[in-house]
Amino acid sequence: MTYPNLLDRFLTYVKVNTRSDEHSTTTPSTQSQVDFATNVLIPEMKRVGLQNVYYLPNGFAIGTLPANDPSLTRKIGFISHMDTADFNAEGVNPQVIENYDGGVIELGNSGFKLDPADFKSLEKYPGQTLITTDGTTLLGADDKSGIAEIMTAIEYLTAHPEIKHCEIRVGFGPDEEIGVGANKFDAEDFDVDFAYTVDGGPLGELQYETFSAAGAELHFQGRNVHPGTAKGQMVNALQLAIDFHNQLPENDRPELTEGYQGFYHLMDVTGSVEEARASYIIRDFEKDAFEARKASMQSIADKMNEELGSDRVTLNLTDQYYNMKEVIEKDMTPITIAKAVMEDLGITPIIEPIRGGTDGSKISFMGIPTPNIFAGGENMHGRFEYVSLQTMERAVDTIIGIVAYKG
């Protein structure tokens, strides 16, 4: 189905810079997210028909569409995030390519282009309307496409009371891209049976498995002396960092893994002979494998300290989120419903693990099973990001189908 306000709504959203800041100590991490929620989203939530609309100190804008059929007793939530990834988001100037011809798309005057030879996903979209960047910023389809789709679904349901639906709760939140947005989510206040994050990629994505994730911070204490007299005295902290890294499995890196394979990812190394630091992220799907990865890093640190004769390697591990499959597989109702709705709409569900996490990873462990459905974005987090308007329309169709489902 086509929705006349969907495109303009999306374009309005992406032009607002809501980039999050991982170094911030506030919630939300940037004032621009507060302003976007209070000045743009809250008024529009009220305009499209949501009731009891409010903004919480945790950065979430919340609203409710009451059920219009007493036989539909479920309460279902839909959640998308306001922030965008760590890439230039100032001056977003989207291009709208109608009836895409399947060829190369020049991204404004930036010199960058979307070429099917480089981005095979473009082969799915001839004849569709694509929204791209101008090559100088990201687009923000992750996840403003999700926000626009949820808002449009509510608008349509309000205008069409003949479509019977259950109670719907909507939540637009901050800081998903920096991994802390759901930390303060109020599950008791949201009060639904289950929810969906509308934060996926291409048409048909339906996901209920995520990585389990941890961060590892390492400190290496060296001993600096003049290199001319260093033998037997110097301990090079940078060399310790190299030695530690070289004891990790050589092929367990993001660029060499796929599917259900986990990894260690070295994110940053800084330091000198005297002192060095390294930051890793650890990812795996199965709980035992996840715990084994953390234990392996600790074992390497312990072994190095034993060989060095002092505690020169310090490891701090912090769990970040867990595979929501552990929660959702106890009651697959949200997956069963979404799958049935997609199939009724002629959409082939793509049920694959997310090689990452969503707000739903944390919210699921707060007591609200929250799988993820497609929002349409491709090549997210950079200048080559784009989205199909037709895929966004199908996401709206899916949301409407879920809340009207009577099975």
Swiss-Prot record:
What cofactor is this protein dependent on?
A: Zn(2+)
Name used for this protein in its record: Peptidase T
**Reactions accelerated catalytically:** Release of the N-terminal residue from a tripeptide
Keyword terms, alphabetized: Aminopeptidase, Cytoplasm, Hydrolase, Metal-binding, Metalloprotease, Protease, Zinc
Residue positions annotated to bind Zn(2+) 2 are 142, 177, 381
Does Iron-sulfur show up as a keyword for this record? Answer: no
GO CC, any one term:
cytosol
Its function?
Cleaves the N-terminal amino acid of tripeptides.
Principal localization reads cytoplasm
Checking InterPro entries in the record gives: ArgE/DapE_CS (IPR001261), Bact_exopeptidase_dim_dom (IPR036264), Peptidase_M20 (IPR002933), Peptidase_M20_dimer (IPR011650), Peptidase_M20B (IPR010161)
| Family, as annotated | Belongs to the peptidase M20B family.
EC numbers listed for it are 3.4.11.4
Enzyme class of the recorded protein, top EC level? hydrolase
User: Which molecular function GO terms apply here?
Assistant: metallopeptidase activity; tripeptide aminopeptidase activity; zinc ion binding
Q: Where in the cell is it found?
A: Cytoplasm
State the active site. 83, 176 (proton acceptor)
Q: Which GO terms describe its biological process?
A: peptide catabolic process; proteolysis
User: Is Zinc a UniProt keyword of this protein?
Assistant: yes
Disulfides per UniProt: none
Paste the cofactor note.
Binds 2 Zn(2+) ions per subunit.
Which Pfam families does the record cross-reference, listed alphabetically?
M20_dimer, Peptidase_M20
Q: Which gene encodes it?
A: pepT
Q: Which residues bind Zn(2+) 1?
A: 81, 142, 199
